[in-house]
């Protein structure tokens, strides 16, 4: 069998029809699977010694979220090292990265595999992989025919990456430097909300504006901050992180602005604060809403005038710092309640970003699950970690109040449980490996604790226990926010919860 001119023309036409790179890539992969009559095909991008799926056909959806590190996938490493078509024999001892990931064929091993490395000049930029269940599935195609396919795919991928590079550098084609893959933090997700967020990150990254990142606990606000920094002109300088919720009031000012020797008991030497460390770079202030009003005033001055004073020093230091702030609270409500300065809010929220909760991201949950499965596979030295159809269905229908962080922990826990129930280095995650609660907390009246046959102390503790549970649920298990809601000190709340058996 050989390719006709019509077949090649059809592939080229499909590459031009798509609206946007993602659509073009998907059309290419779907067309290739039809033309080559294979069971699965994938277009992968090469970045930092790993292959990142861009488009798939015939494979489980979670493959799009996986990141295939070369050291963990010898077949993909062989493709990356090759300069030409790679055909793996049916009896190859090298494990196939897609074993168990072809829907309906989970228990079978892939038999035929062809890899086509894709180049832009001398640079490896990606690969095409073709898989089939029959050992001789690709024998009818010559290497020359497969090279033509690779050339078309390489051209499409190279153009897409070059456009991405030009857009990130805000350059015109005539000013382009030699092709170089753009390395940025991977934001996994193809849902409309995540697509819009990625566009907004691209827009604001090129500027020097302060950014306020809002979103529920566990949605990935720190990852957004990293993506902004890495795509900004400040990327060559440090990104400094500070969790404002973990700052004791007594040392908060020193952490932010530094101190001089002798400024207070224990200040045995001069020390730079986070603003100095982030000079010419970016400072990420996580949980900005936890700062006291006094510190908010000092932070505002830095944003206004660009100078800081170390604790115990009368001299001012000039700093050039871009501030990215994150919060899981509604700062507008905090301003109205008098807990957050309006002028600081407006300084920080020049360009606000909102990270969508996982329950609003549709199929992104499966992509993220695939990413975490691959992480577990590498960490535990397993040959494969795959999700059963029932497990995928369960993940798609659970609302994840803890968002991406809860999903990550659920996958890691499920892998450990699944591994304990079977021998070997292959793990299949079933629905029973996930211990998701059937229902959320009932309404207060249904959850009221009866006091019949209870003494006063028992009734009081039961009431305290239920009140703390409800406060935590309403504040997404943020202890500091729950303490404010209950009008108590967060340290006292932790101690009370421990005494009541609500935490270890």
From Swiss-Prot:
Q: Which InterPro entries match?
A: AAA+_ATPase, GAF, GAF-like_dom_sf, Homeodomain-like_sf, NorR, P-loop_NTPase, Sigma_54_int, Sigma_54_int_dom_ATP-bd_1
Presence of the UniProt keyword Flavoprotein in the record: no
Q: Which GO terms describe its biological process?
A: phosphorelay signal transduction system
Entry-annotated residues carrying 4-aspartylphosphate: 57
Q: Which residues cross the membrane?
A: none
- SMART domains for the chain: AAA, GAF
Keywords associated with the record: ATP-binding, DNA-binding, Nucleotide-binding, Phosphoprotein, Transcription, Transcription regulation
**Could you confirm whether the keyword Transcription appears in this record?**
yes
Quote one Gene Ontology molecular function term. DNA binding
**Which parts of this chain does the entry mark as a DNA-binding region?**
479-498
Q: Which PROSITE patterns match?
A: SIGMA54_INTERACT_1, SIGMA54_INTERACT_2, SIGMA54_INTERACT_3, SIGMA54_INTERACT_4
Sites binding ATP sit at 215-222, 278-287
Concerning HAMAP family, the annotation shows: NorR
Q: What name is this protein filed under? A: Anaerobic nitric oxide reductase transcription regulator NorR
Give the source species. Answer: Escherichia coli (strain SMS-3-5 / SECEC)
- Gene (UniProt): norR
């Amino acid at each position: 069998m050989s390719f006709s001119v019509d077949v090649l023309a059809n592939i080229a036409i499909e590459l031009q029809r798509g609206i946007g790179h993602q659509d073009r890539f998907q059309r290419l992969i779907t067309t290739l699977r039809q033309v080559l009559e294979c069971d699965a095909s994938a277009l992968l991008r090469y970045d930092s010694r790993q292959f990142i799926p861009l488009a798939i056909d015939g494979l489980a959806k979670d493959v799009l979220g996986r990141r295939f590190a070369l050291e963990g996938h010898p077949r993909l490493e062989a493709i990356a090292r090759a300069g030409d078509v790679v055909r793996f024999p049916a009896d190859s001892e090298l494990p196939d990265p897609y074993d168990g990931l072809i829907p309906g064929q989970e228990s079978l091993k892939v038999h035929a595999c062809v890899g086509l490395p894709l180049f832009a000049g001398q640079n490896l930029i990606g690969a095409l992989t073709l898989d089939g269940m029959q050992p001789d599935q690709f024998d009818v195609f010559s290497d020359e025919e497969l090279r033509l396919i690779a050339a078309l795919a390489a051209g499409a991928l190279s153009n897409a990456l070059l456009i991405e590079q030009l857009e990130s550098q805000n350059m015109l084609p005539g000013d382009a430097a030699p092709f170089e893959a753009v390395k940025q933090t991977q934001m996994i997700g193809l849902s409309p909300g995540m697509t819009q967020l990625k566009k907004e990150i691209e827009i604001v990254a090129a500027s020097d504006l302060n950014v306020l990142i809002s979103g529920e606990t566990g949605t990935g606000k720190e990852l957004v901050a990293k993506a902004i920094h890495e795509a900004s002109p400040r990327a060559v300088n440090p990104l400094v992180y500070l969790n404002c919720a973990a700052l004791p009031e007594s040392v908060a000012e020193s952490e932010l602005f530094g101190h001089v020797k002798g400024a207070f008991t224990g200040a045995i030497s001069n020390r730079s604060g986070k603003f100095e460390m982030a000079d010419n770079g970016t400072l990420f202030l996580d949980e900005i809403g936890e700062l006291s009003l006094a510190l908010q005033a000092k932070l505002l001055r830095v944003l206004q005038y660009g100078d800081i004073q170390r604790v115990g020093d009368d001299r001012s230091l000039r700093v050039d710092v871009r501030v990215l702030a994150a919060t899981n609270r509604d700062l507008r409500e905090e301003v109205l309640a008098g807990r957050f300065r309006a002028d600081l809010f407006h300084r920080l929220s020049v360009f606000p970003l909102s990270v969508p909760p996982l329950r609003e991201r549709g199929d992104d949950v499966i992509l993220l699950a695939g990413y975490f499965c691959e992480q577990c596979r590498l960490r535990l030295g397993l040959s494969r970690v795959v999700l059963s159809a029932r497990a995928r269905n369960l993940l798609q229908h659970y609302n994840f109040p803890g968002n991406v962080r809860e999903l990550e922990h659920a996958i890691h826990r499920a892998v450990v449980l699944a591994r304990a129930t079977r021998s070997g280095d292959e793990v299949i995650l079933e629905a029973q490996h996930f211990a998701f609660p059937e229902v959320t907390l009932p309404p207060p009246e249904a959850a009221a604790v009866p006091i019949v046959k209870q003494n006063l102390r028992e009734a009081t503790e039961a009431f305290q226990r239920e009140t703390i549970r409800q406060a935590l649920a309403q504040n997404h298990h943020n202890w500091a926010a729950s303490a404010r809601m209950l009008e108590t000190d967060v340290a006292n709340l932790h101690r009370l919860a421990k005494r009541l058996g609500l935490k270890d």
